[in-house]
A protein has these predicted regions:
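Glycine-biased, small-residue-rich flexible motifs in mid-sequence functional cores and linkers
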Residues: 1-5, 84-360
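Short, small/acidic-rich helices and loops at N termini and domain boundaries
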Residues: 1-88, 345-347, 352-360
Length: 360
């Protein structure tokens, strides 16, 4: 797809080697917009950044080849880039100290501004720990909270599975570019999340899983969420970093206790000693956050409302299910159910290749 001028300016600036989040914020504070930064004189830029970086900016920023790669990635209707200037940018991140200027996203971007809750923990989780994470995630998701985690093995993966099984779905925040999945063992899970949830990253396409990326990923996990639950964690677990960042951002921190003999309970016990709230059920979290389980809706009325919402996102040109999910923010299961209903009532028709179009 062709990049519009504003997005091209964001990309040309953000893809320059040496322009990280803090530097870009400084430049935007001084010059207003990415286009303003790129149009600035070397002398003006040198007041804010080192001369070598100023030269890279005045040379026009990132290469045309780099931008072409991003444009090709955006040809997939499930893929998005959201900037600080966009209305879709998550309001919860705007309240943090250093919100990423750009977010690369794959899936339902409407989830970014829904109430969210994070669940994290050990990569080497026990079977009970994984079961707890999945069960808590499903219950919290059914209460309307999008489940946020980091797509790691163990507790993260279980939390995502629970979120996918709930009515609210899940967001995976990753420490690589969105053109790869890390760890590779979670590729099927990532596929499911992209289809009915959302995967986001602040890192450019092609970014490998460098160790320094994951603390930055962790700050986004807790920045998106109203609170963070640590399910299992050793005393040296990265989940404790996430919990610390959450506390610094004013988020609630919760922990599930375990056996005094279990290494995977020591991190949770340390958090509880430091003031994290001990929880034994998802209801404990809901009560602390002032949330409640939703009332069972009238299914007939809800289905009719869902049909109307979906119809607004189907035009007279053929469109596939993934594109409809992206436009509407609905999960694939909801979309497929509504498509069947709309076809029965004669408002849309199915076409070869799994595509649909409006009839009248």
């Amino acid at each position: 797809m062709a990049l519009d001028a504003d997005l091209e300016a964001w990309l040309r600036l953000s893809l320059i080697d040496g322009v990280g989040t803090q530097t870009l914020h400084k430049l935007l504070l001084e010059f207003g917009t990415p286009a303003g930064v790129l149009a600035a004189s070397p002398r003006a830029l040198a007041v804010v950044v080192p001369p070598r970086l100023a030269s890279s900016i005045t040379a026009g920023g990132a290469s045309d080849e780099a931008l072409s790669a991003v444009a090709a990635w955006l040809d997939d209707p499930a893929n998005h880039i959201i900037t600080l200037a966009d209305s879709e940018y998550p309001q919860s991140l705007l309240q943090t100290a250093d919100p990423p200027p750009l977010l690369y996203a794959k899936g339902r971007i409407g989830l970014l501004n829904q109430p969210a809750f994070a669940i994290v923990g050990s990569r080497n989780a026990t079977a009970q720990g994984s079961a707890n994470a999945e069960a808590f995630a499903t219950t919290l998701g059914d209460a309307g909270m999008v489940i946020v985690s980091g797509l790691a093995l163990g507790i993260d993966a279980a939390a995502h599975r629970g979120g996918l099984a709930s009515r609210a779905s899940t967001i995976a925040v990753v420490g690589t570019g969105l053109d790869s999945v890390y760890p590779a063992r979670n590729r099927p899970l990532a596929h499911d999340i992209a289809a009915s949830g959302l995967i986001i990253s602040e890192f450019a396409l092609g970014t490998p899983p460098l160790a320094g990326n994951f603390p930055r990923r962790n700050r986004l996990i807790c920045g998106l969420a109203r609170g963070v639950l640590v399910v299992e964690a050793a005393i040296s677990s990265g989940s404790l970093i996430t919990a610390r960042l959450a506390a610094e951002q004013g988020r609630e921190v919760f922990a599930i206790p375990g056996s005094i003999h279990s290494p995977l309970a020591k991190g949770c016990h340390a958090l509880i000693k430091q003031g994290a709230k001990l929880v034994e059920s998802a209801q404990d979290i809901l009560e602390e956050l002032g949330a409640t389980m939703p009332q069972t809706p009238d299914k007939t009325a809800a289905a009719a409302d869902g049909d109307d919402v979906l119809l607004a996102h189907i035009g007279f040109e053929p469109v596939d299910v993934q594109a409809i999910c992206t436009r509407s923010g609905l999960a694939a299961a909801e979309v497929n159910a509504a498509l069947t209903s709309l076809e029965i009532t004669g408002q849309i028709e199915s076409l070869p290749g799994g595509r649909w179009q409006r009839v009248h």
